[in-house]
Amino acid sequence: MLYLASRSPRRQELLQRLDVPFQTLQLDVPELRAADESPDQYVQRVALEKAHAGLALVQAADPDAIVLGSDTEVVLGERVFGKPVDVDDAIAMLRELSGRTHQVLTAVVLVCAQRAPARALVVSEVAFDTLDDAQIAAYAACGEPMGKAGAYAIQGRAERFIRHLSGSYSGVMGLPLYHTSQLLTAFGAH
């Protein structure tokens, strides 16, 4: 059985598009970046920790379990933008992203007891239009930025702010479907 180690409704929705049966695991894995950790190392480590935590949870009951862990972070330079803690934090993030091109890093990891983990790191570039304070305040007030890395949802109202995207649209949402499908096929789960 395939298990998704994620609370994200977007990841659940995206994984359903691959027509692979799966169950969702509700896990709390700390997402704290070490001072000497690069953004790509960080996102890959968190995805691996989520997958391993999920495997530890289900392995006794399902020895053949395959667990998918994923993490997405918005990066501008060396700064990693996590999920905003409140509306003011969302506004600050959106002001920094306004008029600039940032990266969205999404790591996907598959683990099981029988083999080494399979991994993918997908890097997308997103160019934001220049936003004025009224646009930022209105978007932050709608609630959509909360719970989203970088304080925006590309699949939602923020799509109108995206001047250019290079990379994986589904990766920016939280689960790059092409790469996930390739990993699942290599693991024999697709």
Swiss-Prot record:
Q: Which NCBIfam families match?
A: maf, PRK04694.1
Query: Which positions are catalytic residues?
Result: 71 (proton acceptor)
Superkingdom is Bacteria
Q: Where is it localised?
A: Cytoplasm
What cystine pairs are annotated? Answer: none
InterPro entries registered for this protein in UniProt: ITPase-like_fam, Maf-like
Q: Per the UniProt entry, what are the Gene Ontology biological process annotations, in alphabetical order?
A: nucleotide metabolic process
The protein's site described by Important for substrate specificity is found at 10, 72, 155
Q: Which organism is it from?
A: Xanthomonas axonopodis pv. citri (strain 306)
What keywords would UniProt list here?
Cytoplasm, Hydrolase, Nucleotide metabolism
Query: What is the protein's given name?
Result: dTTP/UTP pyrophosphatase
Is DNA repair there in the keyword field?
A: no
* A Gene Ontology term for the protein's cellular component: cytoplasm
Asked if the record carries the keyword Cytoplasm, the reply is: yes
